[in-house]
Amino acid sequence: MGLLEGFTFLDLSHRLPGPLAGNLLGGLGARVIKVEDKFYQDPFNDGLFSKMDNAFKDWYKGLNNKKEILKLDFSDQEDRRSLEALVQTSDGIIMGLPSKVRHKLKLTNEDLEDLKKPIAVIELKASKSRKNFMHELNALALTGLLKLYVNGRNEDFISPPFLPFSGIAFGQKVGMDLLAGVLKSKKEGKSSTYTLGKKKKNKLN
């Protein structure tokens, strides 16, 4: 029996940090369901990255081998209802969807508050003003090191720096924050949304 058996988490993220966090939870016995839009799948498995380098498909498998993979049509009403049902039974969500898609799927912070149930949400966002948690390439680009890395190289394709230590550390942080959020929401009987480890206060009646 895993330590998190009986807990359910939804992974609505792509690439490295979010999926890694979900897989860590799955390795502890939680039921983790990675939900993807079947027409806009994780680029590590079906998209720009995987087309450039087959190694990304191996990353995808390794980052998601402790989960159920569910591919839905986010424009289909029946599929959206299936997702809503999963949200109702989940303890936490790794949220990597754009705001527009969250509105479409009724997964905004306000929508989740209306569920009137304890649920923790970790939002994965990076920007120039929030530098505590970001992908390797974001950090390299913002500091100018990425330009230095490619300076003087003439190959048609230049592989990114390896290994993605920041992304791996970020994924572990996401998993820890989500567990903390779940404990707090269950104790208080409220939904809680966190952005990169910083809480946004939500109130429920």
Outline where the language-model segments fall:
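N-terminal helix-loop segment corresponding to the beta1-alpha1 unit
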Residues: 1-194, 198-205
